[in-house]
């Protein structure tokens, strides 16, 4: 669900399978897309290899992935090497799933961990979704309520608009509640309002974000 990386890479991707689907990836990832805690001052891109497995049956979908990034940027990343040894790799595994109770209500969860980082190496998300927007359907709407824990040394470029790490506000990451509503007032026009309230990891400082966006689709 974008807990680890929601970003394109330069390279190759191969997918195969039906109900059980596998995706193999390899290439280079632009570190300018990484969060503020990782940065890209010592290296412009990371070597990347990954594998994803996904399975869907009825109302249930589950998945797991393994990703490896190699770059000198991890040697100087914030709280990445507190043990004293300079590690230049990120080895990240993640699992997730979603269950749809009916056409309107769904519960999703995801967890990820970087086994090479010393700190800020775990992330997790639990989200309850109600309905959902469809850009071609004027008047459609959806809402979600989530609790997220986003560590910057594992969530390198998360998809969430309100997590502060993705917005380069914090080098540590955050934990807290995230609420969002989407509405389609006109065909191919999506409006979104999101609110996050929680604390910054490490410092425990209170953080909150109110985020709004209007998107046009052609």
Regions found by a protein language model. Name each.
Residues 7-9, 46-48, 124-127:
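Charged helix-capping and loop-helix junction motifs
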Residues 1-25, 210:
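Outer-membrane beta-barrel channel domains
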Residues 34-52, 65-66:
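Phosphate/diphosphate-binding glycine-rich loops and adjacent basic-rich segments that engage nucleotide
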Residues 41, 54-218:
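Outer-membrane beta-barrel pore domains
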Residues 25-28, 65-67:
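Fold-independent oxyanion-binding glycine-rich loops
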Residues 9-11, 50, 178:
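Conserved positions at the start
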Residues 2-3, 31-35, 47, 72-73, ...:
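Extracytoplasmic/secreted cell-surface and envelope-processing proteins
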């Amino acid at each position: 669900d974008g807990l680890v990386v929601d970003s394109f890479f330069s390279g190759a991707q191969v997918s195969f399978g039906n109900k059980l689907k596998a995706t193999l990836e390899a290439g280079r990832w632009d570190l300018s897309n990484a969060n503020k805690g990782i940065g890209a001052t010592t290296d412009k891109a990371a070597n990347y290899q990954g594998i994803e497995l996904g399975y869907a049956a009825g109302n249930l979908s589950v998945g797991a992935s393994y990703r490896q990034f190699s770059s000198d940027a991890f040697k100087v990343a914030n709280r990445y090497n507190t043990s004293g040894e300079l590690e230049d790799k990120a080895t990240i595994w993640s699992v997730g799933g979603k269950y749809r109770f009916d056409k309107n209500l769904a519960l999703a969860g995801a967890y990820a961990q970087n086994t090479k980082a010393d700190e800020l190496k775990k992330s997790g998300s639990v989200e309850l979704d109600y309905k959902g927007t469809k850009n071609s359907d004027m008047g459609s709407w959806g809402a979600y309520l989530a609790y997220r824990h986003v560590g910057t040394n594992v969530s390198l470029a998360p998809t969430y608009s309100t997590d502060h790490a993705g917005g380069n506000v914090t080098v540590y990451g955050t934990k807290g509640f995230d609420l969002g509503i989407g509405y389609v007032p006109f065909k191919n026009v999506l409006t979104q309002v999101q609110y996050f309230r929680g604390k910054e990891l490490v410092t425990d400082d209170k953080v909150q974000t109110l985020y709004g966006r209007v998107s046009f689709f052609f």
